[in-house]
Amino acid sequence: DADIRGFFDAIDREWLMKFVEHRVADRRVGRLIHKWLNAGVLEDGVRTYSDTGTVQGGSISPLLANIYLHYAFDLWVQQWRTRQARGDVIVVRYADDFIVGFQHKAEAERFLADLRLRFAKFGLELHPDKTRLIEFGRFAAENRRKRGLGKPETFNFLGFTHICATKRSNGYFTVLRQTIAKRLQAKLAEVKAELKRRMHDPVPEVGKWLASVVDGHGRYYGVPMNLH
């Protein structure tokens, strides 16, 4: 369960341009990206400039972030898994959010130490308070019970809290995914405020808007066993 501290602000532009040039043969693309990075940010009529990072929320920032982490993280992880791991290693990354699962605790600890060094080379740092090694999986509950510990810890990823659970039908292990509580509460508060603002609007219009909100929420969070 990992978090990169201030990722978009920490991107090293020199490394980024090297990665872009390696990935894209057309030099005009590289020059265009270089100009975009150095154009600054206009906010409240004031333009500010920075020598590092890329604007979070910028039109091409997600693309540049993926290019950066492809070289700084993805390719390295593949090599590490092949050369260092004896057990299974599972990696899931979406932009700058990622989780890594290990079969053996010792390999997880070694990977975390190696990852800190790898990221430091490219100006990145794991957030000390948001990066954790937790016991999770099919045998986590039983192993912790034998050691006199409580339930397995949970982790948040891409809007969901992931929980070790068992199916009621057969008792088999499953990963339960529930909407992150704080995110759900924030969304409900947002809807409440908007309904208050629309209180004098025609009911059919309000109903249509509310239906679209509920539909959008359901399309993303509507996974099995998630009641929120």
Region annotations inferred by a language model:
Residues 1-228:
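Non-catalytic terminal/accessory segments
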